[in-house]
């Protein structure tokens, strides 16, 4: 364990520390949505503070030739920046009496506070992935400059959601992004897809899954009635992770024991036109 995660005065026994960290990991896996549609770049190491942030050009097909002399349009970095990887964190407290009671009565240590901190960190990670952070200068999938948009349409009518997502995949296809596609929707829109699609006897969401083979998900971080369709793959976007979600001990305070759940990561958008947001009838086609 790195020294900065567990100080020498850490009060937990080895099995208690393992239980705490396993709880953090389980909650993160259950809660995170953005990672389900993104490739991971890393972990790079907790000391890595910056990462290249490239935007690429070149989506024309590869060449076919006998001797390999035919010229092709090269995939190249159109713009390169270096961005600082932000830290996402949430603190929690374990009371010394709870630790002693668990040991005295030979009971598992209650790590509910760690689970709560991990869930809140997971929510903030998805917030960063979908909306970025304007104060720190980070873009998200819903706010990226150069993304495509389509009108949301009327999802209260059967087939309305399916038609909107068909239109989004069509626009992505026109930009040279042929999938596989993934869809993330706000809970309100997601719930409206659980109805029989016309006279097929099939739920509308199942019809959409045939278009979006990388999954159809809901996220409570998406606001109001909104959604996003992406062409997945690290050639289009990925999540640069320097440190994955883990617990650290902060040192004793008034006999009690504060801990921190933390991670360090950054969404890297390489092809903004591999993203198509569903933003309502007044949305502009491209930003």
From Swiss-Prot:
Function: Shell component of a type 1, iron-storage encapsulin nanocompartment. Encapsulin nanocompartments are 32 nm in diameter with an iron- and phosphorus-rich core (4Fe:1P) about 24 nm in diameter. Upon expression in E.coli most particles are 32 nm, 20% are 18 nm. The core is filled with an average of 14 dense granules, 5-6 nm in diameter that are not evenly distributed. Each nanocompartment is estimated to hold 30,000-35,000 Fe atoms. The minor proteins EncB, EncC and EncD probably lie against the interior face of the nanocompartment.
Induction (free text): Part of the MXAN_3553-MXAN_3554-MXAN_3555-encA operon. Expression is induced by amino acid starvation (at protein level). Not present in spores (at protein level).
Biotechnology: The encapsulin and a cargo construct (an encB-encC-encD fusion) can be overexpressed in E.coli and in human HEK293T cells. In HEK293T in the presence of 0.5 M ferrous ammonium sulfate nanocompartments can be detected and used as cell markers. Coexpression of this nanocompartment with a larger nanocompartment from Q.thermotolerans (AC A0A0F5HPP7) allows expression of different sized iron-rich particles. The encapsulin shell proteins do not seem to mix.
Domain of life: Bacteria
Entry keywords, A to Z: Encapsulin nanocompartment, Ion transport, Iron, Iron storage, Iron transport, Transport
Organism: Myxococcus xanthus (strain DK1622)
Disruption phenotype: Does not form fruiting bodies. Decreased survival when grown under oxidative stress (0.5 mM H2O2).
PANTHER family: PEPTIDASE U56 FAMILY, TYPE 1 ENCAPSULIN SHELL PROTEIN
GO cellular component: encapsulin nanocompartment
Presence of the UniProt keyword Nucleotidyltransferase in the record: no
Domain comment (free text): Has 3 domains; a discontinuous peripheral domain (P), an elongated loop (E) and the discontinuous axial domain (A).
Gene, per the UniProt record: encA
Subunit structure: The 32 nm encapsulin nanocompartment is formed by 180 subunits; monomers form pentamers which assemble to form shells. There are 36 pores where the pentamers meet as well as 3-fold axis channels and dimer channels. The N-terminus of the protein is inside the shell.
Chief location of this protein within or outside the cell: other
Other comment: Shows substantial structural similarity to gp5 of the HK97 viral capsid, and while the sequence homology is weak, it suggests this protein may have evolved from a viral capsid protein.
GO BP term (any one): intracellular iron ion homeostasis
Family per record: Belongs to the encapsulin family. Family 1 subfamily.
InterPro entries named in the record: ENCAP, Encapsulin_nc
Subcellular location: Encapsulin nanocompartment
Name the UniProt record assigns to this protein: Type 1 encapsulin shell protein EncA
Keyword Transport: yes
One Pfam family in the UniProt entry: Linocin_M18
Record field: transmembrane: none
